[in-house]
Amino acid sequence: MTTPDALEPRTCIRVLSTRLHSRRGLYLILAMARTTQADLARQFLALHDGRKTLVLPNAWDVASARIFEEAGFPAIGTTSAGIANALGYPDGQKISRSEMLAVVHRIAAAVAIPVTADVEAGYGAKPEDVAETAREVLAAEAVGMNLEDTVDDRTDLLADISLQKEKIRAVVETSALAGVPFVLNARTDVFLASIGAAETRLARTIERLNAYRDAGAQCLFAPGVKDKETIAQLVSGVHGPLNILATAGTPPVAELEKLGVARVSVGSGPMRATLGLIGRIALQLREEGSFSLMTDGAMTYADANRLFTR
């Protein structure tokens, strides 16, 4: 018979939960869960120490998460756009918080490495709303989250800096109460949304990210930047680990590491690449009646099932 000692921490917790029914047993389970999540959070935070650029793949379901884990990545992020699209929503907080975090929870429960959640602008205009989102992210077993400074679903308007700092502080306080060294990745969309005159964007981005760092954010995210000169200026100007979004034209990881970038994420790129492949398969199947795009390089049926039977 398999014993709890032979299982991974999360599995062990589930097994124990079926055997311990006393109040004391419940407290033991909760303590173990908190310790395990805190350990994963510490592992994830340590990956931002700047000694090596953290390459963070972004999953949209359990299958993609398990593939990234099997590939040897030390941590996984989720992609809000990927999860939303997979469930039939456009990106931009059109999917509900509960639906988003249900997927995050399934991903976190399926892998043995840290998971950080993309929860867009935090699902609320007030700090207390964002604090509740952070509590639910923690309940979903994630150890970090992205927080954008956009307003509602508008891409042309950013939140007031002082209000965004209050939201960040609310997340930091929430994670401290939970006893988890949560990694908050504070994002500004100045470059991504082309906010303001082009010549002002660098200074505005640095101002915002440093304000977010002062409020307690552990990592600082500036999507929409891809030229090496601007990246180098951001690394020099911000007072914390910098996260860059990999898109077409982004320098390779080796160059980003030389520039001092702490973290590179890929967002919805892999999910959209998968959709592109499905589109090509569909076109070949309909127009040619052939199957090579589907069969060449495909994961075997056995390997696909093996992802979920460890």
Model-derived regions: residue spans:
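Ser/Thr/Pro/Gly-rich low-complexity, intrinsically disordered segments
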Residues: S17-R19
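Short, Lys/Arg-enriched N-terminal segments with co-localized hydrophobic residues
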Residues: H21-A31
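Polybasic, low-complexity intrinsically disordered segments
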Residues: M1-L7
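Active-site loops and adjacent core secondary-structure elements that bind or stabilize anionic groups
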Residues: S265
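Extended, intrinsically disordered, low-complexity segments
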Residues: A33-A38, F44, G269-R310
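Alpha/beta enzyme core
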Residues: T35-L45, L54-L56, W60-I113, Y123-G240, ...
